[in-house]
Design a protein with these regions (language model features):
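Nucleotide-sugar donor-binding catalytic core of glycosyltransferases
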Residues: 2-54, 59-67, 75, 84-91, ...
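Short hydrophobic patches on amphipathic alpha-helices
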Residues: 72-73, 97, 127, 234, ...
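N-terminal Rossmann-like NAD(P) cofactor-binding module of classical short-chain dehydrogenase/reductase
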Residues: 81
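Charged, glycine-enriched surface loops/patches
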Residues: 95-107, 129, 294
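A short, histidine- and acid-enriched strand-loop-helix "catalytic/donor-clamping" loop
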Residues: 103-118
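Conserved acidic donor-binding segment of nucleotide-sugar-dependent glycosyltransferases
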Residues: 253, 284-290, 299-305
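C-terminal alpha-helical cap of glycosyltransferases
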Residues: 325-341
């Protein structure tokens, strides 16, 4: 009989997807002990620690390992889930495996292995030491195989049940309402496309981080989308845009799921994953270039009933997909518990 004990090593940040996964595990009756990775390293917070992370050794690794070993000894978990894998080098994982050979090591990430954060040779060499890799990026599977990952589990990103709620806005929340919205951090490609849309008089609002650095977007930028404001924004727009991170080869993102779940019309970049998730022009709308995007935005702003029809079908499709974090975690652990490694 499996114990239901899990140690979860990741960023314990309010509102994060990590928090949602941990909440889901607890709802599924797992006992979860959280080790907050932010205690050991946060990006852009410490130059000295950043140098250690780049090198793959130093006091931060000893401190992390000491805490993890202490918690394993105290908590006696069946699984150790690690999100921030670059805080463990080969020596760290080997020591854990030697001392606790029955413990299952899981590397779980919703980010691409191709991001700069993970493109560290010492970290990539640790992938073969994990019993399981859980990834939300199908395009990364071959990379994990290249580094001799033992067992790879693919899962779609998850969404929160709050995505399906309808939100009435107060007078003070009117800035959250929009015709067209984009939620996401500044990026060069998406900024160029949004600039093109603005110059074509598209009534767009932008929420996210780092847009305030650029004077051109000042009038259209409304700050980050925090806590429940995020759900309110998506539930009170006509059209929400789904841009992808081309640097890491994204083929869908969490927002690809959250936008239709919230009842907005998703207009996103055309990819195979998007077309697997939604029927084109019936549950979501896709575009190949900025001119096509502009054309489709204009069309669906003018054709209100057609837009509502597709948005409603997209929302129903998301309910059928059942891609809440709780559902996804349940599926992941079904695979974990039915695979010996």
């Amino acid at each position: 009989m499996l114990s239901k004990n899990i140690i979860y090593f990741g960023p314990n940040i309010k509102g994060s997807t990590t928090e949602k996964r941990i909440k889901s595990l607890k709802e599924l009756k797992y006992k979860v002990n959280i080790i907050d990775s932010c205690r050991y390293y946060q990006i852009r917070k410490s130059i000295l620690k950043a140098i250690q992370i780049r090198a793959g050794f130093g006091p931060v690794y000893k401190e992390t390992l000491t805490t993890v070993l202490k918690e394993i000894n105290k908590f006696k978990p069946e699984y150790l889930i690690i999100e921030i894998g670059y805080l463990f080098n080969i020596n760290s994982l080997n020591k854990i495996k030697e001392k606790y050979p029955q413990l299952k090591l899981i590397f779980l990430t919703v980010d691409s292995i191709k991001t700069r954060t993970f493109q560290k040779f010492f970290f990539l060499k640790t992938l073969s030491l994990y019993n399981f890799i859980v990834t939300t990026k199908s395009s990364d599977i071959e990379i994990y195989k290249k580094y001799r990952a033992k067992k790879i589990i693919f899962s779609y990103q998850g969404i929160d049940e709050k995505n399906f709620f309808d939100y009435a806005l107060s007078i003070n929340e009117n800035h959250l309402k929009s015709e067209v919205v984009f939620i996401g951090d500044y990026g060069k490609d998406r900024a160029n496309t949004i600039k093109f849309l603005i110059e074509a008089n598209v009534p767009i609002k932008i929420f996210g981080f780092n847009w305030n650095r650029y004077k051109f977007f000042k009038t259209f930028y409304f700050g980050p989308a925090m806590a429940d404001d995020y759900y309110k924004i998506l539930n009170n727009t006509k059209i929400a845009l789904g841009f992808l991170n081309k640097e890491v080869g994204d083929t869908y993102t969490t927002r690809s799921l959250e936008i239709p779940a919230a009842g907005a019309l998703l207009i996103a970049e055309e990819t195979e994953d998007h077309k697997k998730l939604f029927k084109e022009n019936k549950e979501a709308v896709f575009f190949k270039n900025k001119n096509e995007l502009l054309e489709k935005i204009r069309y669906y702003l003018l054709n209100n009933e057609k837009r509502k029809e597709i948005a409603k079908s997209g929302r129903n499709r998301m309910k059928q997909h059942d891609l809440t974090w709780k559902s996804n975690i349940k599926k992941i652990f079904f695979e974990l518990e039915n695979n010996t490694n």
